[in-house]
Amino acid sequence: MEKKRKREQRKLSRRALLAKKNGVNLFEAKNYQKQKRKVARLYEKIMNQRTDFLNKLSTDIIKNHDTICIENLNTKGMLRNRKLAKSISDVSWSSFVTKLQYKADWYGREIIKIDKWFPSSQICSKCGHKDGKKPLNIRDWTCPICHTHHDRDINASKNILTEGLRIQSLAWRQ
């Protein structure tokens, strides 16, 4: 869908240049106006697909789990990274978290937010050894203590779950 949007956007730009070259006002250029409506419909369709996906995913997660542990990410700061900005805004993380939160309230589920500074990808989920900071290009690593091989994302998700359950048990004790 993204390729189609780009192609239609290029057509719109070409139609604008052609109208400008012929000295026609863009409000009077019929082909430009038709293409503009077509591009707007594509943007709306993409937005509806993303919203539908987020609604279905959040509903599925909430219905199948009593406790959800998520990392409290700084999405505004992450959007400043030009290489990540498009993929982060496409995923719409903050919208997903909002949907999870209101559906959790609706269904009586609990969402535990883990601090963004928690070193989830640095800790071995097997033995608890903190291996230190790693650059983002390192996708998997082996713990020097227990020699367990970890995928960075799966290990981080296990650590986030463990930390969330620890926070939950501390809250129950009080």
State the predicted function of each range.
Residues 1-174:
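Positively charged, helix-rich recognition surfaces that bind polyanionic ligands
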